Amino acid sequence: MFYLNVYEELKTSRFHNINFLEYKKKLEEEKKILKTGHNQDELLKIWFIQTAIEIIEQYYECFSLLKKRSYQKAWNILEKIEISFINIKFNNIIYSDCPVLVYIEKYTYMLQKLYPYKIFASPEMLHKKVVCSVCGKTMIPFSDCLHIAGKVYDGEMCYGIVKELDFINVAMVTKPNQKYSVCFQDIENPKRYKVLEYIIPKLKSEFIQWTYNIYTDYEPYSNYKIGRNDLCPCGSGKKFKRCCLLNNQGIAYPHYEFTLP
């Protein structure tokens, strides 16, 4: 099977030389053939390999955007990668034998932690009618639809298609379900991303080993003109008098120490 050979390539350094466009076309052709036999195990493996290739492509794109200082666009790609890994795990697929996927998952999380984003918009909506992408039936308890959103059937991931909804409100949150709806002043200005501005130029290629530790440091209160009832400059969302004013050390901020090869 072609897909088995592809996965063996992904598990080695040969993945750098893969023609992704050609491989995706061949995998889709092989999936169509296997669908006639409804071999769920093989179709799940093909879906996984297609998703793995998509993850690698997106990571290359993300790295390119970071180098171009397009940090917000790179952030959105990182979220797509994160969601793909969630989908893979939801289908009980183990990929610990594939170093490139292990690397990308690790560094996706590490890169996200370097962003200054703290507040996100979280819309609240009532889904009045949702239909299944596999069978087209309404997805409600006790319906005829037996499919589970997020699971793979015949090589395709099931998802709910929202046909009717009511918009309720928008909340400001620190732990969002959708990370792309970030609230950040002057979001396209690269100079607002100080940590990324420091480390990204030092990364010479997409796949090198680098690490960092985060410590809490403090700036003198005198660096800020702030009232007791103003929001604390540390970004906690709390009032100054209930936050850094209490520590008697200054305004807290994260200090990063990087280790590069």
List where the protein language model places each region:
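General secretory precursor processing signal
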Residues: 63-65, 135, 148, 235-237, ...
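Polar/charged alpha-helical tracts
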Residues: 5-8, 12, 21-32, 76-79, ...
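Polar/acidic, low-complexity leader/linker segments enriched in S/T/G and N/D
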Residues: 1-68, 73
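Residue microenvironments linked to proteolytic maturation
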Residues: 91-202
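Conserved aromatic-histidine-acidic binding/catalytic patches
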Residues: 47-50, 69, 111, 115, ...
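Extracellular-facing segments of soluble proteins and assemblies that are Gly/Ser/Thr-biased and enriched
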Residues: 57-113
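Acidic/negatively charged segments and metal-coordination signatures
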Residues: 166-261
